[in-house]
Amino acid sequence: IPRDQIWVTSKMWLQDYKYEDAKKAIETSLNKLGLDYIDLYLLHQPYGAVDEAWKAVEEAQKAGKLRSIGISNMTPKLWNKFVPNFDVTPAVNQVEFNPYFQQKELREILAKDDVRLEAWAPLGQGNADLLHEPAITAIAEKYGKNAGQVILRFENQEEIVVFPKSVHEARIKSNLDIF
């Protein structure tokens, strides 16, 4: 598979947020992956030396090592604390998102900065209540889909970046068949 047809996301862990450690962490990620660049690189949590880590990812992006840079788990309060001090606005904020947890306040803030919300747990971490929600199952039955497909379609229509995970081939195919 050609490299330009594969999207690679990696994260920097909290213990690497000091500036010099952050620079090393980026290089370590590139080396372990055997890549010249990473498509999206995220800070895993908005705690600790966020400003130092962000400076390192901004520099790595300028150097062409990181195509896009973002943050994970940043609440509205933390977004407003950190992002105004960044030179480069994050392209992505990866947070929990599903029909039970729609992050409306955060989405409004991100929209103002033209930032994409990327959902982890887009299917509610397998929450049986969500997958058996009567409104969702009724829509699924009406359109000949399963509850997971309805949820992923909803999130796609809301312009949420989703990446449901599965090791089951049938489920992976089902997750792609949402249109």
Name the predicted role of every residue range.
Residues 1-6, 123:
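N-terminal binding-site loop/beta-alpha segment at the start of enzyme catalytic domains
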Residues 2, 34-37, 65, 89:
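Short loop/turn motifs at secondary-structure junctions
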Residues 7-20, 42-45:
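Structural motif corresponding to the early beta-alpha repeats
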Residues 17-33, 52, 77-80, 101-103:
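Short, acidic/polar
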Residues 22-42, 59-63:
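CE4/NodB-like, metal-dependent polysaccharide N-deacetylase domain
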Residues 45-179:
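Beta/alpha (TIM)-barrel catalytic core signal, keyed to glycine-rich beta->alpha loops juxtaposed to Asp/Glu
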